[in-house]
Amino acid sequence: MSLLSRGLPICTALAMILGGSAAFAETALIGGVSQKDFKGATGAPAGGSASPLYFANNVYSGETVATPDAGATRLTFQDLTELHLGSNSTVVLDHFIYDPTTRTGDAAISFSKGIFRFVTGDIQNKSNVKLTTPTTSLTIRGTNFKLIVNDAGTIVEVKEGHVEIKPCGGTAETRLVSPGEAVQVTASCNVKSIALGDVPTDPGTDAGGPRDGSPGHEPHAPPGRSGANG
């Protein structure tokens, strides 16, 4: 039985699975894989080699998570924030710190390439969650949004809440993206609105919905890199 299925409080479950693997002994446990179906995702510690990421495996600060073509995974962090990765996507989990007592924390995630959905959890000071792509810095305000990172730049499509985008390290004007809007920051730092129909889709980010109770999408605390597949 996994710690997840025991229904333990987040802080208790995390404390019990801190043993982890030796490769991650010097890094902080920040969450785990919450997608039941394995679709090729891998995780690699900073400076280390990649290994498969199965359901209920831990993820750690500094870890690079990647998916192959037609791959997908979903990560759940300490405050129940969800990060969905679609096909051929890579992200670096710089850090994610959360205090469940005060419901405050600090996080940084770097999106290298691919298609993602990000759904905020219980963390209250959401402005401390720093998300970056090669062309954009993003500040979230209670949000559910899709993010596409490719050679053409970055696309942000907001479903709920708001996302403030700062193109190219602040060299261009900051823009607030609202629900029902999609904005692209091009590789040359130009900012433009785009039609929702022009936003790429992917089964890993568009099938079902976050926390919708569909198979493999149950809400739960972060699991651990342990058990039969660990």
Locate the predicted segments by residue.
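Eukaryotic intrinsically disordered, low-complexity regions
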Residues: 3, 225-230
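Bacterial N-terminal signal peptides that target proteins for export
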Residues: 1-11
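Bacterial N-terminal signal peptides
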Residues: 11-19
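Flexible, surface-exposed loop/linker segments and immediately adjacent secondary-structure boundaries
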Residues: 23-227
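Cytosolic regulatory regions built on CNB/CRP/Popeye-like sensor folds
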Residues: 2-4, 17, 26-31
